Protein backbone atom coordinates (compact mmCIF):
# COMPACT_ATOMS: atom_id res chain seq x y z
CA UNK A 1 0.00 0.00 0.00
CA UNK A 2 2.85 2.35 0.88
CA UNK A 3 4.51 1.66 -2.47
CA UNK A 4 1.29 2.47 -4.35
CA UNK A 5 0.90 5.76 -2.47
CA UNK A 6 4.50 6.69 -3.31
CA UNK A 7 3.88 5.87 -6.97
CA UNK A 8 0.72 8.00 -6.99
CA UNK A 9 2.71 10.95 -5.63
CA UNK A 10 5.35 10.39 -8.32
CA UNK A 11 2.65 10.29 -10.99
CA UNK A 12 1.18 13.60 -9.82
CA UNK A 13 4.63 15.24 -9.79
CA UNK A 14 5.38 13.84 -13.25
CA UNK A 15 2.16 15.24 -14.68
CA UNK A 16 2.85 18.61 -13.04
CA UNK A 17 6.34 18.77 -14.59
CA UNK A 18 4.93 17.74 -17.97
CA UNK A 19 2.30 20.49 -17.73
CA UNK A 20 4.95 23.13 -16.97
CA UNK A 21 7.18 21.98 -19.84
CA UNK A 22 4.23 21.71 -22.22
CA UNK A 23 3.03 25.23 -21.42
CA UNK A 24 6.52 26.76 -21.51
CA UNK A 25 7.56 25.14 -24.80
CA UNK A 26 4.26 26.05 -26.45
CA UNK A 27 4.61 29.68 -25.41
CA UNK A 28 8.24 29.74 -26.56
CA UNK A 29 7.36 28.36 -30.00
CA UNK A 30 7.61 30.79 -32.93
CA UNK A 31 4.46 32.18 -34.51
CA UNK A 32 1.35 33.92 -33.26
CA UNK A 33 -1.74 31.68 -33.05
CA UNK A 34 -4.04 34.70 -33.21
CA UNK A 35 -2.55 36.04 -36.46
CA UNK A 36 -2.81 32.56 -37.97
CA UNK A 37 -6.59 32.48 -37.70
CA UNK A 38 -7.63 36.09 -38.43
CA UNK A 39 -8.18 37.72 -41.79
CA UNK A 40 -5.25 39.86 -43.02
CA UNK A 41 -7.46 42.96 -43.24
CA UNK A 42 -8.62 42.83 -39.61
CA UNK A 43 -7.87 45.91 -37.52
CA UNK A 44 -5.29 45.97 -34.75
CA UNK A 45 -8.06 46.75 -32.28
CA UNK A 46 -9.96 43.60 -33.25
CA UNK A 47 -6.80 41.48 -32.92
CA UNK A 48 -6.06 42.98 -29.50
CA UNK A 49 -9.62 42.29 -28.32
CA UNK A 50 -9.29 38.71 -29.53
CA UNK A 51 -6.04 38.29 -27.59
CA UNK A 52 -7.76 39.60 -24.46
CA UNK A 53 -10.72 37.26 -24.92
CA UNK A 54 -8.31 34.33 -25.19
CA UNK A 55 -6.44 35.47 -22.07
CA UNK A 56 -3.17 35.96 -23.95
CA UNK A 57 -2.54 39.43 -22.52
CA UNK A 58 -2.30 38.19 -18.93
CA UNK A 59 1.05 37.34 -17.28
CA UNK A 60 2.39 33.91 -18.22
CA UNK A 61 2.15 32.49 -14.71
CA UNK A 62 -1.50 33.55 -14.52
CA UNK A 63 -2.20 32.02 -17.94
CA UNK A 64 -0.60 28.77 -16.77
CA UNK A 65 -2.61 28.42 -13.58
CA UNK A 66 -5.86 29.32 -15.35
CA UNK A 67 -5.11 26.67 -17.99
CA UNK A 68 -4.14 24.10 -15.35
CA UNK A 69 -7.28 24.82 -13.36
CA UNK A 70 -9.46 24.26 -16.42
CA UNK A 71 -7.71 20.97 -17.18
CA UNK A 72 -8.29 19.73 -13.62
CA UNK A 73 -12.00 20.31 -14.24
CA UNK A 74 -11.87 18.42 -17.55
CA UNK A 75 -11.93 21.55 -19.69
CA UNK A 76 -9.10 21.47 -22.24
CA UNK A 77 -10.40 24.55 -24.04
CA UNK A 78 -11.51 24.94 -27.65
CA UNK A 79 -9.52 24.31 -30.79
CA UNK A 80 -8.46 27.36 -32.78
CA UNK A 81 -9.06 25.50 -36.05
CA UNK A 82 -12.76 24.77 -35.63
CA UNK A 83 -13.70 26.18 -32.20
CA UNK A 84 -14.73 22.69 -31.06
CA UNK A 85 -13.85 21.40 -27.56
CA UNK A 86 -10.39 19.81 -27.50
CA UNK A 87 -11.56 16.96 -25.25
CA UNK A 88 -14.39 16.08 -27.65
CA UNK A 89 -12.00 15.84 -30.59
CA UNK A 90 -9.55 13.67 -28.63
CA UNK A 91 -12.29 11.30 -27.48
CA UNK A 92 -13.51 11.00 -31.08
CA UNK A 93 -10.02 9.97 -32.23
CA UNK A 94 -9.15 7.81 -29.21
CA UNK A 95 -10.89 4.55 -30.35
CA UNK A 96 -8.88 4.45 -33.59
CA UNK A 97 -5.60 4.90 -31.70
CA UNK A 98 -6.54 2.33 -29.04
CA UNK A 99 -7.43 -0.24 -31.72
CA UNK A 100 -4.13 0.26 -33.53
CA UNK A 101 -1.90 0.42 -30.43
CA UNK A 102 -3.71 -2.37 -28.57
CA UNK A 103 -3.58 -4.78 -31.51
CA UNK A 104 0.09 -4.10 -32.24
CA UNK A 105 1.02 -4.46 -28.57
CA UNK A 106 -0.85 -7.77 -28.27
CA UNK A 107 0.66 -9.19 -31.47
CA UNK A 108 4.13 -8.01 -30.49
CA UNK A 109 3.73 -9.64 -27.09
CA UNK A 110 2.61 -12.98 -28.58
CA UNK A 111 5.49 -12.99 -31.07
CA UNK A 112 7.90 -12.17 -28.24
CA UNK A 113 6.67 -15.11 -26.15
CA UNK A 114 7.35 -17.58 -28.97
CA UNK A 115 10.63 -16.20 -30.30
CA UNK A 116 12.00 -14.88 -27.01
CA UNK A 117 11.35 -18.12 -25.15
CA UNK A 118 12.86 -20.43 -27.75
CA UNK A 119 15.71 -18.03 -28.49
CA UNK A 120 16.64 -17.94 -24.80
CA UNK A 121 16.35 -21.73 -24.52
CA UNK A 122 18.58 -22.30 -27.56
CA UNK A 123 21.17 -19.64 -26.81
CA UNK A 124 23.68 -19.10 -29.67
CA UNK A 125 21.72 -21.49 -31.89
CA UNK A 126 20.53 -20.76 -35.42
CA UNK A 127 17.10 -19.63 -34.21
CA UNK A 128 18.74 -17.35 -31.65
CA UNK A 129 20.92 -15.71 -34.30
CA UNK A 130 17.98 -15.22 -36.66
CA UNK A 131 15.90 -13.77 -33.83
CA UNK A 132 18.72 -11.42 -32.80
CA UNK A 133 18.97 -10.18 -36.39
CA UNK A 134 15.19 -9.66 -36.41
CA UNK A 135 15.47 -7.56 -33.24
CA UNK A 136 18.37 -5.44 -34.47
CA UNK A 137 16.57 -4.69 -37.73
CA UNK A 138 13.30 -3.91 -35.93
CA UNK A 139 14.98 -1.50 -33.53
CA UNK A 140 17.10 0.19 -36.21
CA UNK A 141 14.55 0.78 -38.98
CA UNK A 142 12.66 4.09 -38.71
CA UNK A 143 8.93 3.49 -38.53
CA UNK A 144 8.11 6.08 -41.21
CA UNK A 145 10.56 4.47 -43.69
CA UNK A 146 9.21 0.99 -43.03
CA UNK A 147 5.67 2.26 -43.48
CA UNK A 148 6.50 3.96 -46.79
CA UNK A 149 8.18 0.77 -48.06
CA UNK A 150 5.10 -1.27 -47.18
CA UNK A 151 2.86 1.22 -48.99
CA UNK A 152 5.08 1.07 -52.08
CA UNK A 153 5.13 -2.73 -52.13
CA UNK A 154 1.59 -3.70 -51.17
CA UNK A 155 -0.40 -0.66 -52.36
CA UNK A 156 1.49 0.94 -55.24
CA UNK A 157 3.14 -2.16 -56.74
CA UNK A 158 0.94 -5.14 -55.83
CA UNK A 159 -2.37 -3.29 -55.28
CA UNK A 160 -3.54 -5.72 -52.59
CA UNK A 161 -3.81 -3.50 -49.49
CA UNK A 162 -5.32 -0.04 -48.91
CA UNK A 163 -2.73 2.56 -47.97
CA UNK A 164 -4.70 5.24 -46.13
CA UNK A 165 -7.55 5.63 -43.69
CA UNK A 166 -9.43 3.26 -41.45
CA UNK A 167 -12.28 2.35 -43.82
CA UNK A 168 -13.02 2.53 -47.52
CA UNK A 169 -15.74 4.92 -48.68
CA UNK A 170 -19.14 3.39 -47.97
CA UNK A 171 -17.66 0.26 -46.39
CA UNK A 172 -17.69 -0.05 -42.60
CA UNK A 173 -17.31 -3.83 -42.38
CA UNK A 174 -14.91 -5.57 -40.01
CA UNK A 175 -13.05 -7.14 -42.94
CA UNK A 176 -12.42 -3.72 -44.46
CA UNK A 177 -11.09 -2.48 -41.10
CA UNK A 178 -8.70 -5.44 -40.90
CA UNK A 179 -7.37 -4.76 -44.41
CA UNK A 180 -6.68 -1.13 -43.51
CA UNK A 181 -4.99 -2.20 -40.26
CA UNK A 182 -2.55 -4.68 -41.78
CA UNK A 183 0.25 -2.28 -42.74
CA UNK A 184 0.14 0.27 -39.88
CA UNK A 185 -0.24 -2.58 -37.40
CA UNK A 186 2.70 -4.43 -38.99
CA UNK A 187 4.92 -1.36 -38.58
CA UNK A 188 4.16 -0.98 -34.87
CA UNK A 189 4.17 -4.74 -34.18
CA UNK A 190 7.61 -5.12 -35.75
CA UNK A 191 9.02 -2.36 -33.54
CA UNK A 192 7.28 -3.62 -30.38
CA UNK A 193 8.16 -7.28 -30.85
CA UNK A 194 11.82 -6.40 -31.38
CA UNK A 195 11.96 -4.77 -27.94
CA UNK A 196 9.93 -7.42 -26.12
CA UNK A 197 11.93 -10.33 -27.57
CA UNK A 198 15.23 -9.00 -26.25
CA UNK A 199 13.93 -8.69 -22.69
CA UNK A 200 12.16 -12.05 -22.70
CA UNK A 201 15.20 -13.77 -24.19
CA UNK A 202 17.43 -12.33 -21.47
CA UNK A 203 14.98 -13.37 -18.73
CA UNK A 204 14.68 -16.88 -20.19
CA UNK A 205 18.47 -17.34 -20.26
CA UNK A 206 18.65 -16.28 -16.60
CA UNK A 207 15.83 -18.63 -15.58
CA UNK A 208 17.25 -21.59 -17.53
CA UNK A 209 20.43 -21.41 -15.45
CA UNK A 210 18.51 -21.33 -12.15
CA UNK A 211 18.80 -24.10 -9.58
CA UNK A 212 15.12 -25.08 -9.72
CA UNK A 213 15.46 -25.84 -13.44
CA UNK A 214 18.45 -28.10 -12.76
CA UNK A 215 16.52 -29.91 -10.02
CA UNK A 216 13.50 -30.49 -12.26
CA UNK A 217 15.74 -31.80 -15.03
CA UNK A 218 17.34 -34.15 -12.52
CA UNK A 219 13.88 -35.46 -11.60
CA UNK A 220 13.32 -36.29 -15.27
CA UNK A 221 10.77 -33.61 -16.06
CA UNK A 222 10.46 -32.87 -19.78
CA UNK A 223 12.21 -29.74 -20.94
CA UNK A 224 9.05 -28.45 -22.65
CA UNK A 225 7.14 -28.79 -19.37
CA UNK A 226 9.85 -26.91 -17.48
CA UNK A 227 9.90 -24.22 -20.15
CA UNK A 228 6.17 -23.52 -20.29
CA UNK A 229 5.09 -24.26 -16.72
CA UNK A 230 7.96 -22.71 -14.77
CA UNK A 231 10.47 -20.72 -16.86
CA UNK A 232 7.82 -18.80 -18.80
CA UNK A 233 5.96 -17.81 -15.63
CA UNK A 234 9.07 -16.36 -13.97
CA UNK A 235 10.48 -14.84 -17.16
CA UNK A 236 7.21 -13.00 -17.76
CA UNK A 237 7.42 -10.96 -14.55
CA UNK A 238 9.96 -8.43 -15.90
CA UNK A 239 7.83 -8.15 -19.04
CA UNK A 240 5.10 -6.41 -17.03
CA UNK A 241 7.49 -3.53 -16.37
CA UNK A 242 8.73 -3.60 -19.96
CA UNK A 243 5.18 -3.29 -21.28
CA UNK A 244 4.63 -0.23 -19.11
CA UNK A 245 7.92 1.33 -20.17
CA UNK A 246 7.21 0.67 -23.86
CA UNK A 247 4.09 2.85 -23.82
CA UNK A 248 6.18 5.98 -24.44
CA UNK A 249 7.83 4.57 -27.56
CA UNK A 250 4.53 3.04 -28.68
CA UNK A 251 2.76 6.41 -28.47
CA UNK A 252 5.54 8.21 -30.35
CA UNK A 253 5.61 5.45 -32.97
CA UNK A 254 1.84 5.62 -33.32
CA UNK A 255 1.98 9.37 -34.02
CA UNK A 256 4.34 8.83 -36.96
CA UNK A 257 2.54 5.72 -38.19
CA UNK A 258 -0.88 7.37 -38.09
CA UNK A 259 0.44 10.25 -40.15
CA UNK A 260 2.06 7.97 -42.75
CA UNK A 261 -1.11 5.89 -43.20
CA UNK A 262 -3.61 8.74 -42.58
CA UNK A 263 -5.02 6.70 -39.71
CA UNK A 264 -7.68 8.88 -38.01
CA UNK A 265 -6.29 8.67 -34.49
CA UNK A 266 -4.92 11.07 -31.89
CA UNK A 267 -1.47 10.94 -33.48
CA UNK A 268 -2.71 12.31 -36.79
CA UNK A 269 -4.70 14.95 -34.91
CA UNK A 270 -1.53 15.98 -33.05
CA UNK A 271 0.43 16.45 -36.28
CA UNK A 272 -2.41 18.50 -37.76
CA UNK A 273 -2.52 20.67 -34.63
CA UNK A 274 1.23 21.35 -34.85
CA UNK A 275 1.03 22.23 -38.54
CA UNK A 276 -1.88 24.62 -37.89
CA UNK A 277 -0.36 26.25 -34.75
CA UNK A 278 -3.40 25.12 -32.77
CA UNK A 279 -1.86 25.59 -29.32
CA UNK A 280 -4.90 24.58 -27.20
CA UNK A 281 -5.14 21.33 -29.14
CA UNK A 282 -1.39 20.70 -28.93
CA UNK A 283 -1.32 21.20 -25.16
CA UNK A 284 -4.49 19.17 -24.68
CA UNK A 285 -3.16 16.19 -26.64
CA UNK A 286 0.20 16.38 -24.84
CA UNK A 287 -1.41 16.30 -21.40
CA UNK A 288 -3.92 13.63 -22.42
CA UNK A 289 -1.26 11.27 -23.77
CA UNK A 290 1.00 11.98 -20.78
CA UNK A 291 -1.86 11.00 -18.48
CA UNK A 292 -2.40 7.74 -20.38
CA UNK A 293 1.31 6.87 -20.26
CA UNK A 294 1.59 7.65 -16.54
CA UNK A 295 -1.51 5.58 -15.74
CA UNK A 296 -0.14 2.73 -17.86
CA UNK A 297 3.13 2.73 -15.92
CA UNK A 298 1.24 2.89 -12.62
CA UNK A 299 -0.89 -0.10 -13.65
CA UNK A 300 2.27 -2.02 -14.61
CA UNK A 301 3.78 -1.36 -11.16
CA UNK A 302 0.59 -2.50 -9.43
CA UNK A 303 0.39 -5.68 -11.52
CA UNK A 304 4.05 -6.43 -10.84
CA UNK A 305 3.41 -6.16 -7.10
CA UNK A 306 0.34 -8.40 -7.42
CA UNK A 307 2.17 -11.18 -9.27
CA UNK A 308 5.49 -10.96 -7.38
CA UNK A 309 5.15 -11.61 -3.60
CA UNK A 310 8.66 -10.27 -2.99
CA UNK A 311 7.58 -6.79 -4.09
CA UNK A 312 4.51 -6.90 -1.84
CA UNK A 313 6.63 -7.83 1.17
CA UNK A 314 9.22 -5.17 0.38
CA UNK A 315 6.48 -2.53 0.16
CA UNK A 316 4.89 -3.42 3.49
Regions found by a protein language model. Name each.
Residues 1-9, 114-150, 237-239:
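Cytoplasmic-entry segments and transmembrane alpha-helices of multi-pass inner-membrane transporters
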Amino acid sequence: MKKIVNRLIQCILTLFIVSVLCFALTKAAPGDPVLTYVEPNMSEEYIQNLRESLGLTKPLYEQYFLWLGRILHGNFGNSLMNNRPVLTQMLERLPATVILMGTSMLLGFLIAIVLGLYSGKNKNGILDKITSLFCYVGISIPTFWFGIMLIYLFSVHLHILPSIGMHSDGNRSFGDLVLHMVMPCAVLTFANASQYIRYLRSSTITEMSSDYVMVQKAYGMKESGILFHHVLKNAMLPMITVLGMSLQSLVSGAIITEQVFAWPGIGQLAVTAVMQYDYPLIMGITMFTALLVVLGNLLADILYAVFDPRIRKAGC
